């Protein structure tokens, strides 16, 4: 396998067993090696971000946030907006594309089960367009 991969698709590569079994070492390779994160899986990105927090590795956190920002800009939809919003809120991060998506789709979003699961502060944040969180 080429060590200078241009694209890393975590979902596909997980099934090809390219990882060593040591997720910490694999995660470090994303930052210090030649790999970039190209997965569009929100759950994989959250898992990697949590690992970066556990390792206190700011470079890995930055790489994951960069990819989550891309997902937020180009891939966000009705199936993943809630998970992405929760990720940004829980980590005290902001994203203008997420805010724009929510504002543009509020009529559809407010009638979803995910919206009904929000606490009062989150609902007020979304409905009032208060950019203190996202």
From Swiss-Prot:
InterPro entries for the chain: Orthopox_C5 (IPR009177)
Residue intervals of the BACK domain: 88-133
Keyword terms of this UniProt record: Early protein
Induction and repression of expression: Expressed in the early phase of the viral replicative cycle.
Statement: the UniProt record of this protein carries the keyword Cell division: no
Family: Belongs to the orthopoxvirus OPG030 family.
Name the record gives this protein: Protein OPG030
Taxonomic placement: Viruses, Varidnaviria, Bamfordvirae, Nucleocytoviricota, Pokkesviricetes
Originating gene: OPG30
């Amino acid at each position: 396998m080429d060590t200078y991969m241009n694209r890393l698709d975590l979902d596909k590569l997980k099934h090809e067993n390219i990882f060593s079994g040591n997720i910490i070492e694999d995660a470090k390779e994303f930052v210090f090696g030649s790999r970039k994160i190209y997965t569009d899986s929100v759950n994989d990105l959250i898992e990697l971000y949590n690992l970066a927090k556990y390792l206190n590795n700011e470079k890995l956190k930055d790489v994951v946030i960069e990819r989550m920002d891309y997902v937020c800009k180009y891939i966000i939809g009705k199936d993943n907006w809630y998970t992405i919003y929760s990720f940004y809120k829980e980590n005290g991060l902001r994203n203008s594309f997420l805010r724009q998506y929510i504002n543009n789709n509020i009529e559809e979003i407010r009638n979803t089960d995910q919206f009904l699961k929000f606490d009062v502060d989150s609902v007020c944040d979304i409905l009032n367009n208060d950019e203190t969180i996202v």
